[in-house]
From Swiss-Prot:
This is Plakophilin-1. Residues 1-235 are annotated as: Required for binding to single stranded DNA. The modification Phosphoserine is found at residues 4, 119-120, 122, 143. Expressed in undifferentiated keratinocytes of the epidermis at birth, expression increases as differentiation proceeds (at protein level). Expressed in the cervical loop during early tooth differentiation, expression is then present between ameloblasts, at ameloblast-ameloblast junctions and in the stratum intermedium during pre-secretory and secretory stages of tooth development (at protein level). The lineage of its organism: Eukaryota, Metazoa, Chordata, Craniata, Vertebrata. Transmembrane segments: none annotated. Its main location: nucleus. Residues 161-270 are annotated as: Required for WNT-mediated nuclear localization. GO terms for biological process: ameloblast differentiation; cell-cell adhesion; desmosome assembly; desmosome maintenance; intermediate filament bundle assembly; negative regulation of mRNA catabolic process; positive regulation of cap-dependent translational initiation; positive regulation of cell-cell adhesion. It holds the Pfam family Arm.
Amino acid sequence: MNHSPLKTALAYECFQDQDNSTLALPSDQKMKTGTSGRQRVQEQVMMTVKRQKSKSSQSSTLSHSNRGSMYDGLADNYNNYGTTSRSSYFSKFQAGNGSWGYPIYNGTLKREPDNRRFSSYSQMENWSRHYPRGSCATPGAGSDICFMQKIKASRSEPDLYCDPRGTLRKGTLGSKGHKTTQNRCSFYSTCSGQKAVKKCPVRPPSCTSKQDPVYVPPISCNKDLSFGHSRASSKICSEDIECSGLTIPKAVQYLCSQDEKYQAIGAYYIQHTCFQDESAKQQVYQLGGICKLVDLLRSPNQNVQQAAAGALRNLVFRSTPNKLETRRQNGIREAVSLLRRSGSTEIQKQLTGLLWNLSSTDELKEELVADALPVLTDRVIIPFSGWCDGNSNMSREVVDPEVFFNATGCLRNLSSADAGRQTMRNYSGLIDSLMAYVQNCVAASRCDDKSVENCMCILHNLSYRLDAEVPTRYRQLEYNTRNAYTEKSSTGCFSNRGDKMMNNNYDCPLPEEETNPKGSSWLYHSDAIRTYLNLMGKSKKDATLEACAGALQNLTASKGLMSNGMSQLIGIKEKGLPQIARLLQSGNSDVVRSGASLLSNMSRHPVLHRVMGNQVFPEVTRLLTSHTGNTSNSEDILSSACYTVRNLMTSQPQMAKQYFSNSMLNNVFNLCRNTASSPKAAEAARLLLSDMWASKELQSVLRQQGFDRNMMGNIAGANNLRNFTSRF
């Protein structure tokens, strides 16, 4: 079966006129004659050269897909427990030795796995322009080249070379004698891209092997390149170049030419070919082209700078060896240096896209945080957001929306790293600008703006372990409260005040909020909570919804005052339970998981039980009744639902009775027996049924279903049978 050629390098929705994103390709008939990949590229170049003009691009406010991020099971020593299990994703579950308690900390660390990191890719709109001989158009400033210079950003695509990664979940069982509940927090990262063009069949990739290719050490670059200023008299027209004979080796040779025209031509050809052919990336690596392209970032000619940045952007996409080689050749610092001093929008697009691509590799994040974070924040994020602290003398240059989108995509990746997360929290103006942008978009009903998703995912990540890593007013209040309880209980060894502190069953005055929050104080401020809830109520993008719920999930995941205060703020003051409960109806399992985990966290606080009852109980029991369990998130969803029901039913047993249907109880019972494939959900279901049996008001519901002491003993398990029977 012959496939039609790929006729576009960009997502259709990026432009109102699709012609702006097309390459000049041979006819379909020619494509079916079996020409080689190299011949096809050369034919495309020659046909594009003959174009007389190209239409200008439309707005760079690109729409993009609703993909959520995957999970990365990185080792984390949170609470210093943990055993790792792996199914379709990585899972880490912390278990203590509590007899009847369930996890008091079961957090998700959401990071960007390689195969779902969405980073910018670039492709030339028209590889070159044709001008009649002898009548070359006058080039723009800094240009002496007559072919088309404009580069467009194409849809972001996932890395195809790495296996899917999953959640990092951790939890500990409560200490013996105390019934505790699970805490969940989540950690989010990258996913930003646009939908693929469905109207155009895609040519099969030229390199589909998942094995890492063997790379030849790159050739050292000639450091004696000439970077002279462009000369108008040296202009050449594109038809003077023998494009039909251009190859990757010749293009790499062009990079070392002392003529800037040939430098740009070589870089553009590499950029164009690497978009078409994955194997070209390895060839450029072997020929030492990366170091030459990095050197060209220092060229005084803007066309050469733009071409080199675009070529590097495509070279590093999906290629870890090329990313590492770019770093080794000092490419990160050169790119950051050029971004700091360049005022060209097109160059800024290429450089921020390059940095976004590089940021998906963990080995590069530390250097990117150190070098790129200041420039991205000061030159892109703060100016575009419109935020100002009133004392800043920072220049307010106009920033293109696509540059902002690329920059937030890069920071979205960097925020997943532990060191990067803390550095980003402390960087002046970053959180303020991200929050200002999200709030402005919500106020303007632009909740599905593509950059809002990136900003929310950054804020989600920066909220991870906030109570443990950032000094907050809650921590100071909790410290003072603990000292007060310790002094009062020092005369007796049987006081339960310490238990109350651990289980959040105490009343303490919550700290007053800052009138004008700054930096990390924004992350737990009521204005931020209100913004997240408003966004959850208005956005239709699954990734944005998941990020909002994940940020709230992180804020409610601790065992102290912050979780209590945030839960009350969300559920009572801001009346956010309806928005959260609606997440459980989503068709996206990532969204359902985040919503269910957030409700599980909030249900730990008795002060919320009454308000949560009728608003949450119907949706949570519906999950236990109808959830099919056929997704990778099913175990987390079902275990969260069991814990939420368990918490709420103890304080409102009569209300709970009306929602305990036969089908729900049968599903929970079957879940108890499914210990092999869903151990966490089975444990949560077992604890739910055990507490129902222990309740005088609810035991009758189980008896009506045919449950008896022997059956409940079997559910408890042989090891726990003695403890179980002793409770009745």
